[in-house]
């Protein structure tokens, strides 16, 4: 069995999750309490039944002058027939319930059931209603919001739900990891390309170490010194028996790319060589990684390492719009990302639910767009959502933004660690926060300065278009026919450019979003109809193409290339493709759900630079598995550290080993009939990126939990894009994959998890596998050394007797 004893820090989130809903407060409470329960999951095709039980906990009868608001992941509501209480969607993921004319006063202590249907499904606890609060109206005036106690009853029969982790299957899967080799010094993540033992005495680091470097590597030396001292207690001095030397690579032709480095260890000398500061930084991270699983005195065996990445772009997107991640926490992530040689932070700072970056001259974006709270007109803040609370001034995950100074500081911090930040302005869809903020600006100025009021408007008052986005918004798309829309976009781009310049950096690209524009948009807009007539357009996609080509020109005018989600490169005329190919920095291809997965290679073959963002491998917000207590989404499958590891950049159809139902995929035939990656296409695979959308995240602990350990597969595959099993088939492919996977888990077990626990990084431990055989219960776990306890106390060491009635 694989047994590991870890410090408690690594288990903290599991405990915290049990008590996440237990909040205590002395603030006034509403006169009611709610209990929510799940009903039939398929009461009608595409609908499930659920019920709120409303209880009057006050001393007075409950009248008709109230509304209860709540948040929940987006879904439609269906309520047929007469009802005493109406439930409806306000917008997106914000809902309300209120008494109808049929409502009879509810006596103190009495309860009533409010049953209704919702679309989709509900099979995990992070998707239930939350953030309930009460507003009472007296004499036509609203009172202050009051929190409503909400108890969500356990989901019925979770073990029968699709994707529920079967303990026996986990046990069988864990058997693949048997026989993992003992780790050697150079077994780090991401794996080095080549490590060879050499002649020379081993190096022992203890107490003091000398560090020598030329001036052009001073920044890398400073960071190395901080880590050696802070993590390993080594005092860096001018002269010591052991010396670390950072030096320029003598033969620059040896460098495969700008990130290439070498390390030579032996005879009291550690020499890191590279042609660039980035290469030196990579070498220092490898040195630090080799120390992770060691105890003082730190023994380093004589070795020569040659290493470089296969893919130039290795990024992680963090969504701070849905739920806010503070600057100090994002810096923590940048530091961790850099340690695994990830070199891009995709800064998703705006979406429908918030705008999180100060833009001088557009103060409403943060004065309104960064705050969520109770409102009926959104003149001062956005609607609550994702349990951000009803107080727009409270310090919650719903509120907050980065000041200009904080963002510049983040840019500098990341650049020191060779992490480039790519900002994203979601457009034209997913833009509700910006649209509402610019409406607030209009209302602020329309009487005193009409020109200023309309200068940056993103919507048209006369637009009668009817649409519903994937997230159930009806007003989240910019009007692409308004000159003010492009004025707004250019203003934000120019302010971003100025921030980068002040940080001493060059802004290369801005990600423009471009995804999930819903059907029906723009068709009721007089301005759009005028533009379509003028340009000879016949369909909504023509307007999308117009927007992205216009924005590509705006970017080019400002010395930049554009980036965007895969939609920015799809369905265009050849004339538009010719323009966009030359102006694109990156097309982020995300939809690899079966039936849509050919888009990735089609886009690369068409000459666009592609960043692989495969939902099935790299969407970190996908739940680890189907257990109802696992936070996350599951529309693209389940993603754990083995799934991210299995991704093949140059063979994406074989990147998943099971389908979305958990059934094995025939890897030998997975590519048949699919678009092949051409030689031109191969040159346009720029890199890989993980995505962490934040709809189900409620804290920074939750951010870390969903990232670690699954981000390690992303780091490994970006650095080593051609693993040993890539071109194999049948049993040889399976054996090669399992051997590599076993070594990968051994690295996680022995080096990474103990390091995370020691340094306050929250992470997930996988659940054990169980097998009942011959009257005994067998257990195993993927993490080498993890403790397995039977019931609540006994440490599992051997099979336990079990009869058919045991629980």
Give residue ranges: language-model regions.
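Low-complexity, acidic Ser/Thr/Pro/Gly-rich terminal tails and inter-domain linkers that flank the onset
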Residues: 27-44
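Asparagine-centered strand-capping/turn motif at beta-strand->loop junctions
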Residues: 54-58
């Amino acid at each position: 069995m694989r047994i590991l004893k870890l410090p408690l820090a690594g288990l903290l989130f599991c405990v915290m999750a049990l008590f996440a809903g237990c909040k205590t407060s002395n603030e006034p409470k509403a006169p009611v309490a709610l209990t929510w329960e799940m009903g039939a999951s398929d009461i009608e095709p595409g609908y499930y039944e659920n019920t709120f039980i409303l209880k009057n906990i006050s001393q007075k009868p409950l009248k008709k002058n109230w509304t209860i608001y709540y948040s929940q992941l987006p879904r439609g509501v269906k309520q047929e027939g007469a009802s005493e209480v109406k439930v409806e969607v306000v917008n997106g993921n914000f809902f309300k319930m209120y008494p109808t004319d049929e409502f009879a006063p509810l006596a103190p202590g009495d309860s009533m059931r409010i049953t209704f249907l919702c679309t989709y499904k509900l099979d995990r606890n992070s998707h239930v209603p939350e953030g309930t609060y009460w507003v009472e109206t007296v004499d036509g005036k609203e009172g202050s919001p009051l929190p409503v106690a909400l108890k969500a009853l356990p989901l019925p029969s979770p073990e029968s739900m699709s994707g529920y982790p079967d303990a026996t299957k986990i046990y069988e899967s864990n058997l693949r990891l048997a026989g993992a080799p003992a780790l050697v010094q150079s077994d780090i993540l991401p794996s080095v390309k080549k490590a060879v033992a050499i002649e020379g005495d081993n190096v022992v680091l203890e107490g003091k170490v000398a560090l020598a470097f030329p001036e052009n590597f001073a920044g890398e030396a400073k960071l190395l010194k901080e880590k050696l001292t802070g993590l390993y207690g080594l005092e860096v001095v001018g002269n010591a028996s052991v010396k670390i030397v950072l030096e320029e690579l003598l033969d620059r032709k040896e460098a495969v790319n700008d990130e290439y480095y070498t390390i030579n260890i032996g005879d009291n000398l550690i020499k890191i060589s590279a042609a660039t500061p980035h290469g030196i930084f990579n070498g220092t991270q490898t040195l630090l990684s080799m120390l992770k699983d060691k105890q003082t005195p730190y023994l380093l065996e004589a070795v020569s390492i040659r290493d470089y990445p296969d893919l130039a772009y290795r990024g992680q997107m963090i969504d701070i719009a849905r739920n806010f991640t503070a600057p100090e926490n994002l810096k923590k992530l940048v530091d961790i990302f850099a340690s695994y040689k990830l070199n891009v932070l995709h800064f998703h700072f705006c979406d429908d639910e918030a705008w999180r970056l100060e833009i001088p001259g557009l103060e409403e974006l943060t004065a309104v767009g960064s705050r969520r709270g109770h409102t009926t007109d959104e003149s001062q803040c956005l609607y609550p959502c994702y349990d951000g609370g009803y107080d727009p001034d409270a310090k919650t995950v719903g509120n907050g933004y980065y000041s200009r100074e904080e963002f510049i500081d983040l840019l500098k911090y990341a650049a020191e660690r060779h992490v480039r930040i790519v900002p994203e302005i979601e457009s034209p869809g997913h833009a509700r926060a910006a649209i509402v903020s610019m409406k607030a600006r209009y209302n602020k100025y329309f009487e005193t300065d009409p020109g200023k009021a309309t200068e940056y408007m993103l919507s048209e008052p006369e637009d009668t278009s009817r649409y519903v986005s994937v997230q159930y918004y009806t007003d989240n798309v910019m009007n692409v026919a308004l000159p003010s829309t492009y004025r707004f976009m250019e203003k934000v781009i120019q302010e971003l450019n100025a921030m980068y310049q002040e940080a001493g950096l060059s802004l290369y690209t801005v990600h423009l979003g471009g995804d999930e524009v819903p059907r029906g948009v723009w068709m009721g807009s007089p301005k759009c109809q005028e533009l379509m007539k003028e340009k000879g357009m016949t369909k909504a996609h023509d307007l999308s193409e117009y927007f992205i080509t216009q924005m590509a020109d705006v970017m080019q005018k400002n010395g930049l290339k554009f980036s965007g989600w895969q939609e920015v490169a799809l369905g265009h005329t050849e004339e538009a493709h010719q323009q966009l190919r030359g102006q694109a920095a990156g097309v982020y291809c995300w939809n690899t759900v079966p039936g849509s997965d050919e888009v990735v290679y089609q886009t690369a073959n068409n000459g666009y630079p592609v960043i692989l963002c495969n939902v099935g491998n790299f969407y970190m917000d996908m739940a680890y598995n189907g257990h109802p207590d696992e936070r996350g989404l599951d529309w693209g499958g389940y993603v754990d550290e083995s799934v991210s590891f299995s991704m093949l950049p140059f063979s994406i159809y074989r990147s998943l080993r099971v389908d979305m139902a958990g059934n094995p995929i025939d890897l030998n035939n997975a590519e048949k009939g699919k678009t092949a990656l051409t030689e031109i296409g191969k040159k346009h695979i720029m890199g890989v990126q993980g995505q962490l959308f934040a709809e189900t995240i409620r804290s920074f602990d939750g951010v870390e939990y969903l990232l670690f350990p699954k981000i390690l597969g992303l780091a490994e595959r970006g650095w080593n894009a051609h693993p040993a099993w890539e071109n194999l088939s049948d049993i040889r492919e399976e054996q090669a994959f399992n051997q590599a996977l076993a070594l990968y888990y051994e690295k996680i077990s022995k080096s990474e998890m103990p390091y995370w626990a020691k340094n306050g990084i929250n992470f997930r431990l996988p659940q054990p596998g169980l097998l009942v055989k011959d009257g005994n219960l067998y257990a195993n776990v993927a993490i080498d050394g993890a403790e397995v306890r039977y019931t609540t106390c006994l440490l599992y060491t051997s099979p336990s007797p079990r009869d058919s009635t045991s629980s």
